[in-house]
Amino acid sequence: KRTNNQDYVNLFVNRAGRTMIILADGMGGHRAGNIASEMAVTDLGVAWVDTQIDTVNEVREWFAHHLEVENQKIYQMGRDEAYKGMGTTLEALAIIDHQAIYAHIGDSRIGLIRGEEYHQLTSDHSLVNELLKAGQLTPEEAEAHPQKNIITQSIGQKDEIQPDFGIVSLEAGDYLVMNSDGLTNMISGSEIYDIVTSDISLDDKAATLVRFANNAGGLDNITVALVSIKEEAAE
């Protein structure tokens, strides 16, 4: 619903034919957030396209190196008055054979739909989630917390980032859902499950998720990437 879109997502294929999807939700005044998210996605994507990487271990090493390079690049830009407060969340997901490997910074999310359930794979790097994990807030209090949008890590911070990495084995019939917090602030995991498993095209599923979140009163940008796992490979 926001007029300026600070979210950005794109898909890239490297020389070994391996796909990576990268999603970012930028922050910062004026256009700083738009620039940060587009820059992080594009810089990482351009670097990925040039690799021959073909194993999850190589992807993990690649993530660890390139995410910090991008963190420093955006941090340096953010020191300029025009880009004050510039930063971005980042979700990057590569699919290698029957495995997905991902890197996570911030409060965008990656989820897996398998069988009857939506599983959130990532844990938000947010103040509210830290308080929740420490037992200082109940899930209900966390939902309605006024500082819900404060994140504890982002690409563009001064300190070295500590990304979360994960690997998930994929099965036919799985869906991977990547989204900015504009979606999950507005609709529940069970609603995401119902829409993604409904009998409509993949594009329509993504569009329906966004529409539902907007109808629920979504005030933020909402960006979604959906991956459907078939018998042979990912679509």
Q: Where are each of the predicted segments found?
A:
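PP2C/PPM-type serine/threonine phosphatase catalytic domain
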Residues: 1-235
